[in-house]
Amino acid sequence: MSLIKIDQKAYEYNLRHIAKKIGSFQRLICVFKDNAYGHGAKLLAPLAKNLGVSFVAVKSEEEAREIEEFFENILILSHRPHGNENSRFIYALNDISQVKNYKQDIKIHLKIDTGMHRNGICVENLEHAINLIQGSDLKLTGMFTHFASADEMDGSFFVQKENFQKAKKIVKKYFSNLLFHSYNSAALFRGKIPEDEYCRVGLVQFGYGDSNLKRVLSLYAHRLSQRILQKGQSIGYGGIFTAAKDMEVATYDLGYADGLFRYNGRGELVLGNGKAMLGKMSMDSFSCENSGEEICVFKDADIWADFFHTINYEILVKLNPNIQRVLV
């Protein structure tokens, strides 16, 4: 069976490095949405808790329930209000017109649109939003935003920072002791984090985004069969690869049904052990030079992201949750 290995020491190293940058584990919000970016939320939750993390963010109520035993505070980022929210959790308020649809007396964090224009309330409408919240029984405990271009060297990041500072100044006139968070993974290493803010960290906790961090996830496959591919013989659908000489090849138990991008046999896709994939990837398998019973498919998602002209996030979150994940 294919296997994902999670490097426990690397993960703990990364969290300590991030906490040092922020100032403490208490100001750290670990984002565990989408199965912790493919790494395995339930596997990593106790590690984060043991280091001192008490606040996490997830996508949905279902994700929150999976790890609620580990954390005091869980923020649900992408919730559609239905009137039966769980008071155990904190909910993001992404659209002020939805105030009346939430169950009353639950805790919310107000999302501010500082320039990404995806979710949230723009700064110009903030006082109106505050009035609506004050007229409800919702408990506003925090406010946050998301930087759209923190990893780009342009001025929009600084515009968004300034907009959030304006929003904080407004909301502080009406509420005290709110929890603020704007800095995400991309913004973490771009300057000093405001003293009154927490920091939400997503993919950076798994070793991406800073050269001082360590990759946490590695993907492995196991051999199904092996054979001698004779000179002139082809392998896989369409016979894209033809052997230039006799060679020993093997088929391994990982394919595009497992969440990998489908390799079409064109270009050189290098695996984690330096061997190239041979021929088109199948639904449940791929072939390469025989590399033993177990082969590392990748240790660095950036390599596959570059090959398929996408981002490392997409490579990781697509990994099938049914692939076994183990701590090493």
Swiss-Prot record:
User: Entry's InterPro entries?
Assistant: Ala_racemase, Ala_racemase/Decarboxylase_C, Ala_racemase_C, Ala_racemase_N, Ala_racemase_pyridoxalP-BS, PLP-binding_barrel
Positions carrying N6-(pyridoxal phosphate)lysine are: 33
What molecular function terms (GO) are annotated for this protein? alanine racemase activity; pyridoxal phosphate binding
A biological process term (GO) from this entry: peptidoglycan biosynthetic process
Q: Which GO terms describe its cellular component?
A: cytosol
Q: What does the record give as cofactor?
A: pyridoxal 5'-phosphate
Tell me which Pfam families the record gives.
Answer: Ala_racemase_C, Ala_racemase_N
Transmembrane stretches in the record are none
Give the record's keywords alphabetically: Isomerase, Pyridoxal phosphate
Reaction catalysis annotation: L-alanine = D-alanine
Q: Which Gene3D superfamilies match?
A: Alanine racemase (3.20.20.10), Lyase, Ornithine Decarboxylase, Chain A, domain 1 (2.40.37.10)
What does the entry list as the binding residues for substrate? 118, 283
Cite the active-site annotation.
33 (proton acceptor), 237 (proton acceptor)
Pathway field of the UniProt record reads: Amino-acid biosynthesis; D-alanine biosynthesis; D-alanine from L-alanine: step 1/1
EC numbers, comma separated = 5.1.1.1
Protein family per UniProt? Belongs to the alanine racemase family.
Q: What does this protein do?
A: Catalyzes the interconversion of L-alanine and D-alanine. May also act on other amino acids.
**Protein's name according to its UniProt entry:** Alanine racemase
Ranked from the top, the taxonomy reads: Bacteria, Pseudomonadati, Campylobacterota, Epsilonproteobacteria, Campylobacterales
Q: Give the encoding gene's name.
A: alr
